[in-house]
Amino acid sequence: MKKKQNDDKLENIKQLENQFLNIIDIGCRWGFAERFINEKYHSIMKIYGFDADKLECGRLKESYKNTPEGFINCVPLALAESPGKRNLYITKEPGCSSLYPPIKYLSDNFPALKCTALEKVISIDVTNLATWAKSNDIKTLDYIKIDTQGSELEILRGAGSLLETTVCIDIEVEFNPLYEGQSLFWETDAFLRSNGFSLWRLSNLVHYSSEEKSIELNEP
């Protein structure tokens, strides 16, 4: 989702000198988008990747050890709307774990969603973007990507006024719930529009059928 009337802001970004653009990747399991890793961005960007799995953060840190110091920062934290304690629902595929319980009917009846089958529940500490940014003296969240299995909207709410510094948000949404109590597209869209953003496009549309595989709905 891209912010309305951001031409002036984009022009200002082009003119930045000696100031880093902060790329926030929440749910960074498996690594960062290649478009950001390019060495031409090493001197103008800082990437902050969040994942609740400390082992995964350690793996990512090792895999990017040859990048300049401070360019990629792996943060082993779970984000939510407010700091505190939350349950983390660990699923068969760790990348499908969520702050919300997976819907059992789906993993039982849709083969492509067996990955969301619940394995265990643990209690974890969570924080929010505003608190984390303040404690790390970060003033802007220039680009935000969120893929956190249903908790995306509350993470955005936890950014508070820092959303005013954001130019673009790449966020996973669902039209039908995969997790109990999760936010859906219409709620996320309404929240972002109320904060000055407008929808740019929907990509990677997927339909989960009762067959073995998910169905990609994107046009060529």
List each model region and its residues.
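Phosphate/nucleotide-binding beta-alpha loop and adjacent structural elements of enzyme active sites
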Residues: 1-220
